[in-house]
Amino acid sequence: MDSKMILYRGSLKSCNYSCSYCPFAKHPSSAREMEKDRMDWMKFCKSLEERAEDLGRFALMVVPYGEALIHPWYWEGLAFLSRLKQAEAVGVQTNFSFSAGQSGKLWREAKGRKEKLRLWATYHPEMVSPARFAKECREAAEEGIALCAGAVGVPENLSLIGELRRCLPDEIYLWINAMDGLKRAYTREEVQAFSAIDPFFIRELSAVPANFKNCRNRLFVEGNGKMQTCNISGRMPGNWYQEDFSFPSAVCRQKACSCYLAYGGRGDWVNTLLFGKYPLFRIPRYFPAVFLDIDGTLLQEGEREIDPLTAASLKVLKKMGTRLFFATSLPVPEAKKRCANVWELFDGGIFAVGAHLLWKEAGQKHGQMPRNKIRQKEALHQEYQEILYPLDEAVLSAVKARYKSLHCRLYAYRNKGKLYKITLCRREGCGWERAEERFLQDVLPETRKGSVRFLREENCMQVIPAGASKENGVKI
């Protein structure tokens, strides 16, 4: 069962801050309004407990208009939910103005699971100094609480936000949201300055076309039970509290995902790679190296080149020191053609399902290559190293003798004259059966049957050396 990401926003509209740009600044709420918010929240928490078994694994984040964590019932509810075995993470957006001592006591008394708590801490320069805010973040991190910090990218606040970055530990990510209502584009200097603070800021500047197909298993629930796919998608039929509730399919009426709560919650591989299983918590992951497929990952069906947002994300990973490698069934020339706009960001890769390995040396010690594998290693040119697993010409001759009866086209791939892959390709939508794979195995010479591997990929049958695979390529 797929994991679910649920956002909750109750009726709370009051805040203890008075930021000049915020409509909820010092918004007064009556005792009756506060009690309604409390009752709605506790009702929602109880309903999550009752539905947890049906929902399966999930994460919950509170995204209030006002400040939630100055009210004890939010701490109590989050702690309650954190004890559910199906709840993998619980979090909230906050200005970090709550009392750490009092809140920690509430959490402990409610037996909350601290390792599941996630905080999205927003810095408001008008209300708190960078040093004070950084101190609160640092102390929370030292308590073992996972968090991110961030601010709205107001150009006039650049120096203060830069100071906050210097005050924060390196391991706490400081994000920058593009400013709504700026009424002009950011200057080149401003983009560079904000990107130096938040390497992912470039993602805020690219419009992401809406696509509800990327928004499965996410839901935005209001205090009265009304639902949306995300905070901007528009209302969907039904209500969270209806008796015949089932997790709804995504509905979207927008043309673009215009904020992080919208584009950050999509099921895109980029979001998961950068920010983990539940990217809406905005806590980055860091890798020394990543291996990425081309078809279905870097390029979706129908795409002719890698989209600007994906390209920008890859540039950020490269800048942060992550080594990028391809892991694809495509041969090198085809991969280079299809990924021309990002090719230089990659340090090589695993091509032709592992039959052709190519990489730039980076001074690190590579794993020991298997001694019992047929291989050829040589410099492709000065900056690359290469391993090629050759395929015997007798295999090609045997396949050529029979392939026409399978109603397909045959492509043989060579590097410097050496055969390393055969692809049998049918028209789109026509797959391959296991019996056809056995038929091809039977036509091989007896002395070559153990040296070949067949791999069915949609409308293609790949014929490669037995020692070649993406998994082995990663190990090498």
Predicted features by range, described:
Residues L106-W107, R304-R414:
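Active-site phosphate-binding/coordination module
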Residues R184-I283:
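Accessory C-terminal segments flanking Radical SAM cores
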Residues I6, K26-M39, L55-H71, L81-G101, ...:
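Core AdoMet radical
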Residues T94-F96, A149, L314-R338, A412-G429, ...:
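Substrate-recognition element of Asp-dependent hydrolases with the DxDx(T/V) motif
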Residues D2-K43, N231:
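Canonical Radical SAM [4Fe-4S] cluster-binding loop centered on the CxxxCxxC motif
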Residues Y286-E303:
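Asp-based phosphoryl-transfer active-site loop
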Residues L60, V128-A207:
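Conserved C-terminal portion of the radical SAM core fold
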Residues A394-I476:
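Conserved acidic, metal-coordinating active-site core of Asp-based
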